[in-house]
């Protein structure tokens, strides 16, 4: 079957932004103008096409990136059809994982900014992620009709906060309730959209006289940026003072794809102005799959190889999202990087080294779906029927092994105990949590060996709230959650040479007799528990030695200070005595347990607390505040670096986990939400005396 659209007319783009910049509304308008949706969905009415999970419609925020396919022939209907795949990405900080994941499979992005709020904190995070994956991007300043809208203020903020190089290719005509349209700086014409046709119709006109000088100034700025694409153009520009429309577009395209500039436009998606021109810019300036370097990967011997975006190449694809669909069950969204895939094919999951059979292939139009028979290089679609594939896995031709680069997922930073409200739901809850963990790699589930409770861990409080909420909605499991907890440990600091334990019961009949002498010493951190049998001359008979070790091991689970597990100790059994009749395993087990407890009390016991490696990315103005706050949380600041590409500082510190609860909220308020942080477990370290005292007091029987 021949390819419907040549690959150079493909655009795989993301629309990403801060939480209220109007991103979902912008996506909705894109779908309306490209003819997918005939009735516009509004986020605030809870009916937007891409927000298809119930919670998203209720909360008015986008949680999962739906991949939508549409076709565009240009605002003036003068282009051949272009195939656009749009990944709608969430803007909330607890869902950054979704944004990372979609950035990985995009070729370009549209950054949507609010004309009033400008460059907000989450926009900075998303910008850094786009830098990380070197994604070319456009900027669309939305909500130009709102009170306080200011296009040029956003331009300045992009330069100052993002260290970006924005190049306006339009300027607004008016603002707030006087926002009528835009000046197209390439054609030097005004564009006014017709309200009655919901913006489907528009006309070019002359630039209003009062805007002419301003438009000239910004056109010059744009032509200069275009001229910098090559020496040849620069010479022509210096000689003639201008460039042709085709030259400007081609040069801006080259520089956008090289991540040197960000073409900037404006409009109001809600009032149907500007989105059509943004779609034209996606085609004019963002790359097709063949405009960017071929995808790198590793072969079986871990040597680097590449896969070209061509139908004739061997098949390779990356799974970037798992979702559960109410009708077909589990969907796996994949981006095909090379070759072709037909339904019914058998492919290799090269990460898990398992074969997978492709059931149906469906292309999503938000939550409607169209079945397709094959997908080719550049396509994004969802596959039904995969058994072992999870997010980040590579699928490839089973005769041409490749692992495309893995996505790196952050470790969860917050954990809570969760239990079903009724015993009957226990099994259902386990199933639900495992299904949710398969969809979301930043969410983990485990069973706590000490308490037997189910512990869920994730990227933040909102993240876990939504997980609990989804259990209730999608799986009908109501659960109660506990307070976030810290896992402390205990150990000793001194060696005790001779610790005696004697268990004797002799009151008529069969007695009990066990007697051991132990040496207890601290081990270096992370060594764990070690038991040494140094008995000479049979003072403790062979058959009782395992019972002695068992007695010590059982006592390890609950330390003498506050009942936390004991780690990093070495116990040597070197002497003891026994009774021919009364000695048995139980007596020796009890004697060992008593000796060990006694020894721990005498060997300077301490409590160890988990230390976290914390990284805060913050604008420079707040670096002092952030460092001060980390120090007040008993943190050790270990260094400060520049953020790659400018735009702030990365502060690295080691902070006790117990001091990090509520940190997201306090960091948000201390930096007006402009800083982000990540943390992961580093090691256990001795808690200071005042902290130990507080823990011991809180654990003491009341």
Curated annotation (Swiss-Prot):
It is found in: Cytoplasm. GTP binds at residues 17-24, 88-92, 142-145. Residues 8-290 form the tr-type G domain. GO terms for molecular function: GTP binding; GTPase activity; guanosine tetraphosphate binding; translation elongation factor activity. Its main location: cytoplasm. InterPro entries: EFG_II, EFG_III, EFG_III/V, EFG_IV, EFG_V, EFG_V-like, EFTu-like_2, G_TR_CS. This is Elongation factor G.
């Amino acid at each position: 079957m021949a390819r419907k659209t040549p690959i150079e007319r493909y655009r795989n783009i993301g629309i990403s932004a801060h939480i209220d910049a109007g991103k979902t509304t912008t996506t909705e308008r894109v779908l309306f103008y490209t003819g997918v949706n005939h009735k516009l969905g509004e986020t605030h009415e809870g009916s937007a096409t891409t927000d298809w999970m119930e919670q998203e419609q209720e909360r008015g925020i986008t949680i999962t990136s739906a991949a939508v396919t549409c076709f565009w022939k240009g605002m003036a209907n003068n282009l051949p059809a272009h195939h656009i795949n749009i990944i709608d990405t969430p803007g909330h900080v607890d869902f950054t994982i979704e944004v990372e994941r979609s950035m990985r499979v995009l070729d370009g992005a549209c950054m949507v900014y609010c004309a009033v709020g400008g460059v907000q904190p989450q926009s900075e995070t998303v910008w850094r992620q786009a830098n990380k994956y070197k994604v070319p991007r456009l900027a669309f300043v939305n909500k130009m009709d709102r009170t306080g809208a200011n296009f040029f203020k956003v331009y300045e903020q992009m330069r100052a906060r993002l260290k970006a190089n924005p190049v306006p290719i339009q300027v607004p005509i008016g603002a707030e309730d006087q926002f009528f349209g835009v000046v197209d700086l390439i054609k030097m014409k005004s564009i006014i959209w017709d309200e009655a046709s919901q913006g489907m119709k528009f006309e070019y006109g002359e630039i209003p006289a009062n805007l002419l000088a301003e438009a000239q100034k910004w056109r010059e700025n744009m032509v200069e940026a275009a001229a910098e694409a090559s020496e040849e153009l620069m010479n022509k520009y210096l000689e003639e003072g201008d460039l042709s429309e085709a030259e400007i577009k081609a040069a801006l395209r080259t520089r956008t794809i090289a991540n040197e500039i960000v073409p900037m436009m404006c409009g109001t998606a809600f009032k149907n102005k500007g989105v059509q021109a943004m779609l034209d810019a996606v085609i004019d300036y963002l790359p097709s799959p063949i405009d960017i370097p071929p995808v790198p990967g590793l072969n079986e011997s871990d040597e680097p190889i590449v896969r070209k975006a061509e139908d004739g190449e061997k098949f390779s694809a990356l799974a970037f999202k798992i979702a559960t669909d109410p009708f077909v069950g589990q969907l796996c969204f994949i981006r095909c990087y090379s070759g072709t895939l037909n339904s019914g094919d058998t492919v290799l999951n090269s990460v898990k080294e398992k074969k997978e059979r492709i059931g149906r292939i469906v292309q999503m139009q938000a939550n409607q779906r169209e079945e397709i028979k094959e997908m080719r290089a550049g396509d994004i679609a969802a596959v039904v029927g995969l058994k072992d594939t999870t997010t980040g896995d590579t699928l490839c031709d089973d005769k041409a092994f490749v692992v495309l680069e893995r996505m790196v997922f952050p470790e969860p930073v917050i954990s809570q105990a969760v239990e079903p409200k009724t015993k009957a739901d226990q099994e259902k809850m386990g199933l639900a949590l495992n299904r949710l963990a398969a969809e979301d790699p930043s969410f983990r589930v485990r069973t706590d060996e000490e308490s037997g409770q189910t512990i869920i861990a994730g990227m933040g409080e909102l993240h876990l709230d939504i997980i609990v909420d989804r259990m209730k909605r999608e799986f009908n499991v109501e659960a109660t959650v506990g307070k976030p907890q810290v896992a402390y440990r205990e150990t000793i600091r001194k060696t005790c040479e001779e610790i005696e334990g004697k268990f004797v019961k002799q009151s008529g009949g069969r007695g009990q007799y066990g007697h051991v002498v132990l040496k207890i010493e601290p081990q270096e951190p992370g060594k764990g528990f070690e038991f040494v049998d140094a008995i000479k001359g049979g003072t403790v008979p062979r058959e009782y030695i395992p019972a002695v070790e068992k007695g010590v091991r059982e006592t390890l689970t609950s330390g003498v200070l506050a009942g936390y597990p004991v780690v990093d100790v070495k116990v040597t059994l070197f002497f003891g005595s026994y009774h021919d009749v009364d000695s048995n395993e139980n007596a020796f087990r009890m004697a060992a347990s008593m000796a060990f407890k006694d020894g721990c009390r005498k060997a300077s016991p301490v409590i160890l607390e988990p230390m976290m490696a914390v990284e805060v990315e913050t604008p420079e103005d707040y670096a002092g505040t952030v460092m001060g706050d980390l120090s007040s949380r008993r943190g050790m600041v270990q260094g400060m670096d520049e953020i790659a590409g400018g735009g702030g500082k990365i502060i690295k510190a080691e902070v006790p986990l117990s001091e990090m609860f509520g940190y997201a909220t306090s960091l948000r308020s201390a930096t007006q939400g402009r800083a982000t942080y990540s943390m992961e477990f580093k090691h256990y370290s001795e808690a200071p005396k005042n902290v130990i005292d507080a823990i011991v007091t809180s654990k003491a029987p009341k």
